[in-house]
């Protein structure tokens, strides 16, 4: 495809337009008085959101070069979301200000590379100061952080605080939709471990990049699976039952993984696979724990068990399994509660007779996973749109609270960034020329989150920042008063602020040092066979159904795998998918 090229100031100005386009839509979502953004969806009702990452992902700009700028700032939001779970709007606001100030200075003759060095020096200084101001999160502060992160929603803050108190910070907390109007907290059996899906093709929710299986059957084995020959009988039983299916194995690779993906995509099986957690003997022990939790039989080589002998009775079950790219969460049924309790007691006895402190720690980790259970936050709402909105708010608040437990908290409302901005003066004075300018770009950007929080609450941002500096107090946008924000419980997770700063400086510096921008030139839409305005589907043949191969391996008669369906010309039956069923 032909490329459109843009050079030097022209390219940077076009990129800036894209950055501003996204940032101006995103920054209304920051603070306790934030505004909502309504997003049209191709199917279903529109979404109403107050989440920077969600807004940024939906934006496309007609100008291809400006759209590159939009995608760069969307990357800031998504990266911060992925790493910290919150802080996307803060990161976006910081990036926009750095880009704007940087481009002004470049237009005046500043060297982009020196600006970049200055910005990076400023970032290092800011992160050091941020760490020194961070304090550990006490138990009573958990609800405060959760409430602030939920935009001041005390109900959400209370529910998350209760969930954290019951399952502890290491426990599993999941958010799901409820059939009622009320948002409730439910504690059930379950656990999570650090392994994700074997292939992204198993994802069931493309927007969240998550695979969710409701009431699945579960095969657990310590064997490596590279071919599905031995699993054909059990797969046929699963297909007949219509149940979702999870394979948890030492590894699943090659032909076996390819075949599962093909059958998943063709709708033959609702299946996913996950590699077993840990390594060596600890892996086997972890699989035994999961087998107890789900009521499965561990198919182990040590017991001379083979996959071809697996029956439906050997499989485990769960209420729900949620799999991300790096984590699996199992919500179990209550009927395994006694088995889990017995397993925990057995592990406690092992701790008492184990002399190695390292082994004791590892066994205690297993006990915590098994005994902790899963806290289910069931989100209730009157409409589908409200449900999505509340669910996003709870997920953001939960992520921010976990981040606060990890690295502590600082005064919220942007107050900490303003204090550090003043400290940057000392570093700026010891630097020269464009290096100093780069530091000052970061210094000015640190004021922007507070200005936008104030603006969203109906106040003048510049006046608010000046008053914060004069009074040496923070600004409570809820009450419109200046006060000690730590005493008021307005706290920001240090991790969220740190990652927002790192991601914003990274993208802003890259954009400022860009000299050439290249984008595809959009091709004009081709006219249909009948000319402009004609039915675009005209002239197409009928669409045939995919042909279905049999189940099994080549050479097994009518159960060949992967079998090709009939391949015909358009309108003659269509092209079959390779599959095994």
Swiss-Prot record:
Highest taxon listed in the record's lineage: Bacteria
Residues annotated as binding ATP: 29-32, 86-90, 413, 492
Positions of region (Disordered): 522-541
ATP-binding is among the record's keywords: yes
Reaction(s) the record says it catalyses: ATP + H2O + a folded polypeptide = ADP + phosphate + an unfolded polypeptide
GO CC, one annotated term: cytoplasm
Compartments reported by the entry: Cytoplasm
Pfam families cross-referenced by the UniProt entry: Cpn60_TCP1
GO MF, one example: ATP-dependent protein folding chaperone
PANTHER family: 60 KDA HEAT SHOCK PROTEIN, MITOCHONDRIAL (PTHR45633)
Subunit structure: Forms a cylinder of 14 subunits composed of two heptameric rings stacked back-to-back. Interacts with the co-chaperonin GroES.
Family from the record: Belongs to the chaperonin (HSP60) family.
Protein name per the record: Chaperonin GroEL 1
Species of origin: Prochlorococcus marinus (strain MIT 9301)
Phylogenetic lineage: Bacteria, Bacillati, Cyanobacteriota, Cyanophyceae, Synechococcales
């Amino acid at each position: 495809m032909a490329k459109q090229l843009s050079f030097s100031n022209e390219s940077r100005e076009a990129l800036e337009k894209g950055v501003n386009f996204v940032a101006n839509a995103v920054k209304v979502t920051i603070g306790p008085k934030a505004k909502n953004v309504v997003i049209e969806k191709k199917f279903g009702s529109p979404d109403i959101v107050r989440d920077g990452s969600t807004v940024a992902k939906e934006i496309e700009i007609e100008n291809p070069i400006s759209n590159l700028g939009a995608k760069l700032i969307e990357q800031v939001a998504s990266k911060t979301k992925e790493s910290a779970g919150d802080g996307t709007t803060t990161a976006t606001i910081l990036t926009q200000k750095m880009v704007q100030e940087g481009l002004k200075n470049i237009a005046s003759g500043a060297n982009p590379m020196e600006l970049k060095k200055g910005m990076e020096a400023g970032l290092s200084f800011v992160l050091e100061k941020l760490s020194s101001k961070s304090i550990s999160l006490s138990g009573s502060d958990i609800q405060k952080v959760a409430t602030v992160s939920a935009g001041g929603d005390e109900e959400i803050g209370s529910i998350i605080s209760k969930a954290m108190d019951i399952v502890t910070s290491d426990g599993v907390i999941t958010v799901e939709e409820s059939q009622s109007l009320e948002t409730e907290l439910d504690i059930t059996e379950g656990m999570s471990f650090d392994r994700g899906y074997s292939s992204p093709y198993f994802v069931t929710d493309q927007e969240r990049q998550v695979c969710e299986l409701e009431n699945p059957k579960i095969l657990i084995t310590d064997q490596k699976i590279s071919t599905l020959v031995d699993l054909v009988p059990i797969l046929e039983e699963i297909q007949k039952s219509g149940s979702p299916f999870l394979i948890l194995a030492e590894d699943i690779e090659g032909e076996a993984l390819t075949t599962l993906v093909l059958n998943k995509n063709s709708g033959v099986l609702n299946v996913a696979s996950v590699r077993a957690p840990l390594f060596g003997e600890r892996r086997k022990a972890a699989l035994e724990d999961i087998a107890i939790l789900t009521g499965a039989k561990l198919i182990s080589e040590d017991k001379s068990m083979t996959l071809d002998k697996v029956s439906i009775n050997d499989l485990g079950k769960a209420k729900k399994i949620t799999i991300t790219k790096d984590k699996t969460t199992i919500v179990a049924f209550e009927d395994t509660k006694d088995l889990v309790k017995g397993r925990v007691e057995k592990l406690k006895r092992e701790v008492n007779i184990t002399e190695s402190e390292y082994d004791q720690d590892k066994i205690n980790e297993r006990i915590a996973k098994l005994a902790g259970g899963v806290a289910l936050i069931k989100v209730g709402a009157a409409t589908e749109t409200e449900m999505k909105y509340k669910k996003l708010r709870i997920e953001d608040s939960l992520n921010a609270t976990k981040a606060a437990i990890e690295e502590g908290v600082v005064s919220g409302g942007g107050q900490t960034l303003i204090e550090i901005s003043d400290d940057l003066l000392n570093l700026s004075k010891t630097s020269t020329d464009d290096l100093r300018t780069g530091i000052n770009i970061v210094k000015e950007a640190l004021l922007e989150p507070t200005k936008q929080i104030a603006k969203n609450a109906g106040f003048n941002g510049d006046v608010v920042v000046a008053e914060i500096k004069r009074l040496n107090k923070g600004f409570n946008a809820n009450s419109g008063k200046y006060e000690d924000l730590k005493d008021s419980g307005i706290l920001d997770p240090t991790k969220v602020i740190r990652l927002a700063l790192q991601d914003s400086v990274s993208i802003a510096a890259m954009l400022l040092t860009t000299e050439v921008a290249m984008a595809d030139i959009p091709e004009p839409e081709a006219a249909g066979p009948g000319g402009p305005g004609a039915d675009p589907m005209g002239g197409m043949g009928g669409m045939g159904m995919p042909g279905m191969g049999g189940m099994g391996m080549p050479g097994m008669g009518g159960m060949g795998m992967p079998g090709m369906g009939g391949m015909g010309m358009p309108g003659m039956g269509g092209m079959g998918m390779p599959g095994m069923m």
